[in-house]
Amino acid sequence: MRSLLALMLLPLAGFGQQELPDPLQAGWKGKKVCEVLVENESVRTLRCTFPPGIGHEKHYHPKHVGYTLKGGTFRITDAKGTREVNIPEGYTFYNEEVPWHEVLNIGSDTAVFLIVEPKD
């Protein structure tokens, strides 16, 4: 019986993520925080800007590389909980995928990131 239930629920795995916006679609209180710099058949590159008190509402990320043009202090909430992090200028990161998170710039400076999403 458990096997049958597991098979019936399998198509719903990941359903919530598909309902979430991607980084370009997500914004903050109805306003965009990311803009497309480059998009072609191989890659999409976004610049995301977060003045103090501005965040990025709950969204998912496909595989991506990020680079911090201007650092800042953020409150990040994801499946692991909520934490505050200082992201320095020049910080580079890679994620295979981020099922969901939301962020808020709690610092006093505007932070700017490049997000590069390869299209496989």
Can you annotate each of these PLM segments?
Residues G81-V98:
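Short acidic-glycine-tyrosine-enriched beta hairpin
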Residues G27-E57, K63-G66, V116:
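A short glycine-rich, His/Asp/Glu-containing loop-to-beta-strand
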Residues M1-Q18:
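Bacterial Sec-dependent N-terminal signal peptides
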Residues E57-P62, H101, N105:
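His-enriched metal-coordination microenvironments in redox/metal-binding proteins
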Residues G55-H56, G72-I76, T92:
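Short beta-strand segments in beta-sandwich/barrel cores
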Residues H61-K80:
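Glycine- and acidic-residue-biased ligand/ion/polar-headgroup-sensing regions
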